[in-house]
Swiss-Prot record:
Function: Catalyzes the first step in hexosamine metabolism, converting fructose-6P into glucosamine-6P using glutamine as a nitrogen source.
Keyword Transferase: yes
Keyword Lyase: no
The protein's Enzyme Commission number: 2.6.1.16
GO molecular-function term, one example from the UniProt record: carbohydrate derivative binding
Enzyme class: transferase
Gene name for this UniProt entry: glmS
Name of the protein in its database record: Glutamine--fructose-6-phosphate aminotransferase [isomerizing]
Active site positions, chain numbering: C2 (nucleophile), K605 (for fru-6p isomerization activity)
Subcellular location: Cytoplasm
Major localisation: cytoplasm
Gene3D superfamilies recorded: Glucose-6-phosphate isomerase like protein, domain 1 (3.40.50.10490), Glutamine Phosphoribosylpyrophosphate, subunit 1, domain 1 (3.60.20.10)
């Protein structure tokens, strides 16, 4: 969601801040701003609603933004509308601050500060922190560090932030609470950001702050205290992300690029995890993990958005292949209800970023209950979920910039299928299913390449659907969640209203929506449910609904049926295969409608607040 980039150097930091802000755009934002301390020890601040180019234009106009220390922020509105006055940084006399998170008790603090003469110019919770730091600093005459340590004890919520003080222009202070923060290491300069992508042009060396850490940065020194105010040393991590991996290349949008990267992402997901004798192995899982997998009798899967749909698919795999009961729940619901943990249960959390706030809360809450352990599947080795879980498996999908997840979804499914097969072998001591899954997955990268050859057919369908206001997706079995994912993608990217239903539910209500204007996408692979879904197709046809069917080369339909045939006749991999044309469909509908595909309105790539 919101993005932080800050720098302290022997040289002017303005360009570093601007370039960093540009690289944070993919996270989603509606306003932005930056502030520096100049040679006169003045705080110079620029803020703007809308795009970062507005800030760049302001810099060119003022020609005053020169300083060796600065903080910048891209804001996604939570408290207060998307207005200039609510954009960060927020300033209180000598204090300037940027903040990611939500302060839950800000109104109480605000009231007390107003009684002490503080005037608020924004509607945000962040301005409360700035004034509170100033108030405590002047009241107690403490050092900036001691003041901040006092202030955070009075805050309830999440408050990852970076603070600078014009009376102390040689240091930045950063606090990690709730949202991720990392330090970038340079020569005679250091940086703080919420996302390493913002700094990859200037450094590959990073220090990831732990929850509760406070860091003090000068241009040549870094000091870190943990949540207990004890001096600590955090390891330096060298990033292996190549700078060209975060460019669009010859593609118009990141989403299109990432859809087409799926054959290679899946190959990376299975690389070194399938042996020559068709065995599945995860180097991340030690003997303790295998012992845990052997004991589990139930799995609770927790996720949000697209990851939730991946979890829904895997429920079918775990129950059919592993013979383990499985519950899939939205993280934000799981966090705030009383629940019963079944005997010998595993908590399995899915997240693209590994920083999803609701999923983190679910993981932390689960530690109060008697789970055998927690397993996280995500795409970031340095994420909070990986750090706080018992075990983790990386999808190895590569950097995903587009807000709508594509290759993260298919690699999650790939890993989940492998886990289901592995558990089957561990529990039954029979390698047949594991061998079959391993052998089939070897073919998956090539199959996905062939599926992408349907691109022009999908574009033609998108042209037909681009002016439609309502679209229904239906599927059965493990392809019902793929219908859900197809509808979600269309909503996210093209802003077209779409709903997904289990096909058998049509006659229980949704069939009332069907008439000659109703567009219905049907997922109909040649599996054991094909006759059932053909009955659903007949129900729709007799009511005049307009059908668009995705199927294989074996399944026969009436001659006048609009069918897009995919080059896969199997059953096991159909969820992974059939979602790819639905991703393309959402992309092309959005393209034809002229939408901002990589940065859809009101959405963020990494949802780091509840």
């Amino acid at each position: 969601m919101c993005g932080i980039i800050s720098a302290i150097s022997k040289k002017n930091v303005t360009n570093i801040l601007i370039e960093g802000m540009k690289r944070l755009e993919y996270r989603g934002y509606d306003s932005s701003g930056l502030a520096i301390i100049n040679k006169k020890k003045e705080i110079i601040r620029l803020r703007s609603q809308g795009k970062i180019k507005n800030i760049i234009n302001l810099i060119h106009k003022t020609k005053q933004l020169i300083g060796n220390i600065g903080i910048a922020h891209t804001r996604w509105a939570t408290h207060g509308l998307a207005l200039k006055k609510n954009a960060h940084p927020h300033v209180s006399k000598n204090i300037a601050i940027v903040h990611n998170g939500i302060i839950e008790n800000y109104l109480n603090i605000k009231t007390k500060l107003q009684k002490n003469g503080y005037i608020f110019t924004s509607d945000t919770d962040t301005e409360v922190i700035a004034h509170l730091i100033h108030y405590e600093q002047n009241k107690n005459n403490k050092s900036l560090l001691k003041t901040i340590q006092t202030v955070i004890l009075k805050l309830t919520g999440s408050y990852s932030m970076v603070i600078m003080d014009r009376y102390h222009p040689n240091i930045l202070i950063a606090i990690r609470s709730g949202s991720p923060l990392l330090i970038g290491l340079g020569k005679q300069e250091n940086f703080i950001s919420s996302d390493q992508l913002s700094l990859l042009k200037i450094t590959k060396k990073f220090i990831y702050l732990n929850e509760g850490d406070i860091a003090i940065l000068s241009h040549k020194k870094i000091t870190i205290f943990n949540k207990n105010s004890i001096l600590v040393h955090r390891p330096i991590v060298i990033s292996n992300i190549q700078n060209d991996s975060i460019t669009k290349g010859h593609y118009q949008h990141y989403m299109k690029k990432e859809i087409y990267e799926q054959p290679y992402a899946i190959k990376n997901a299975i690389r070194n995890r399938i042996t020559k004798n068709e065995k599945i192995q995860f180097s991340e899982l030690n003997n303790n993990a295998h012992a845990l997998l052997l004991k589990i009798e139930h799995i609770d899967i927790i996720a949000c958005g697209t990851s939730y749909n991946a979890g829904m698919v895997s429920k079918y795999w775990f129950e059919s292949l592993s013979k383990i009961s499985c519950n899939v729940e939205i993280a934000s619901e799981f966090c705030h209800r009383k629940f019963i943990v079944k005997k010998n249960s595993l908590l399995l959390i899915l997240s693209q970023s590994g920083e999803t706030a609701d999923s983190l809360t679910a993981l932390r809450n689960s530690k109060k209950h008697e789970y055998l352990g927690s397993l996280v599947i995500c795409n970031s080795s340095s994420s909070s979920l990986v750090y706080e879980s018992n075990f983790s498996i990386l999808t190895n999908a590569g950097i995903e910039i587009g807000v709508a997840s594509t290759k993260s979804f298919t690699t999650q499914l790939t890993i989940l299928l492998m886990i289901a097969a592995k558990i089957n072998n561990l529990k039954t001591n029979d390698e047949k299913i594991e061998n079959k899954v391993a052998k089939t997955l070897r073919l998956l990268p090539e199959i996905t390449k062939n599926v992408l050859k349907c691109d022009s057919l999908i574009y033609s369908l998108a042209k037909e659907l681009s002016d439609k206001n309502n679209i229904i997706f239906i599927g059965r079995g493990h392809n019902y969640p793929i219908a859900m994912e197809g509808a979600l993608k269309l909503k996210e990217i093209s802003y077209t209203h779409a709903e997904a239903y289990a096909a058998g539910e049509l006659k229980h209500g949704p069939l009332a929506l069907v008439d000659s204007s109703t567009q219905i996408i049907v997922i109909a692979p040649n599996d054991n449910l094909i006759d059932k879904i053909k009955l659903n197709i007949s129900e729709i046809r007799t009511r005049g609904g307009v059908l668009h069917i995705f199927s294989d080369n074996l399944t026969k339909f009436n001659d006048n049926t609009n069918v897009i045939r995919l080059p896969y006749d199997g059953i096991l991999l159909s969820p992974i295969i059939y979602v790819i044309p639905l991703q393309l469909l959402a992309y092309y509908v959005a393209l034809i409608k002229g939408k901002n595909i990589d940065k859809p309105r009101n959405l963020a790539k990494s949802v780091t607040v509840e």
